[in-house]
C-alpha cells in the first residue's frame, strides 16, 4: 500500500508540473524570507480559539483600522526585504486564517506581485497558523500537507502544525519547504523545552521521509523555532549544524569536521549557527537578543556546484532602520512592535525577518 501511495504521489506531482510552461534560460536569483508577523488576526470572533484579545472590544482593541494599517506595514516589509524584487517565497508565522492572507495579497501593494499562498488550519489554542507565500513565476506549486507535532508527554497538547510545501523551481528541480512555528517558551525556557524537542523530532522525521523518496533532496526549513541554533532541539535532535567553513554563509563561523563515514546527504545546515550577526538576533526579550528565526537547508543546497545553491554570505537578519526603535527599558534598539504588552505601538512585529539568497542556473 505504501509503495502504491508513493508512486501515485510522484505521478500526480509530475502531471501537475507538466501543466506549466518552461522557464526562461540563464541565471536567476531566488530570495527566501521568513517572518513572524506578531498576531495577524482578523477582527471577527472565532468561538473555537482564544482570540478575544484581538476583537474591537477586546483587551487590545483590535479594530479594522488597525488591521488595515498592519497589513500595509507587512507589505512594506516584504517589499523592502526583496530589494530589487520581492522574495520568491515567504514563510509567515502567527497568521490566524485565510481571510487576513487574502487581504494581505489583494488590499496592499503586494497585489501586483503575483503571490499565491497555502497555510495550515491547525488546533493551536491561540488560533494562529503558519503560511507560505510563493510567486508563481518562480515556484511551481505542486502540493502541500500539514503535520501535527507528536508530543511524547502531553498527547493532548496542541500547537501549530508543520506546513510541508513541494513544487518545482526554475531549474526544473523539486524543492521541499517546511514552515515551522515551534512551541513557545511560555512558562520558562527549561520548563517548556520538551515541547520544542518533540517538534524538532517530528520535523526530522518529515525531512527523512523526503530523503527516502529522493537520495539528494533540496530541503528548505524556515520559521520561528523559539530556540536558538545552539539549543538541543536544533543541534542534537534536528541535527541542523553550522555550514562547513568552505561553504559558510556566516562570516566568522568555525570549520566543522565530520567523521569520514558521515552520510552528508542526510545533513541539515543551519545558516544562523556559529559566527557573528548584526543584529545579534531576530527577537529581543528583557534586553537579550536571540536568533529564534532561522533558515535551514539540506546539503544539496549548500553545494555551489549544484544548479540551485546558496549564495555565500547572503543569509542574514533583515533589520532596516524603520523596523527598529530605541529600547527605553533596556539598552540599544528593539523591534518596532505592533503591541508592547497591551499598549498599541503601531509598528510591524516583535520579530525581525530573516532572508537568504539562492542562485539558480536554468539550462536548455
Predicted segments, located by residue:
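Metal-dependent phosphoester/phosphodiester hydrolase catalytic core
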Residues: 48, 159, 169-201, 205, ...
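Second-shell loop/turn segments in exported
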Residues: 58-65, 86-93, 119-120, 151-152, ...
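Metal-dependent phosphoester-hydrolase catalytic domains
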Residues: 208-219, 227-364
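Structured beta-strand-rich core segments of catalytic domains in phosphoester-bond hydrolases
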Residues: 37, 95-183
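Bacterial Sec-dependent N-terminal signal peptides
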Residues: 1-27
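Structural recognition of the beta-strand scaffold that forms the well-ordered cores
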Residues: 31-34, 88-93, 116-118, 131-134, ...
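Extracytoplasmic/secreted cell-surface and envelope-processing proteins
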Residues: 42-43, 99-102, 126-129, 186-189, ...
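N-terminal, active-site-proximal structural segment of metallo-dependent hydrolase catalytic domains
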Residues: 23-114, 118-130, 200, 328-332, ...
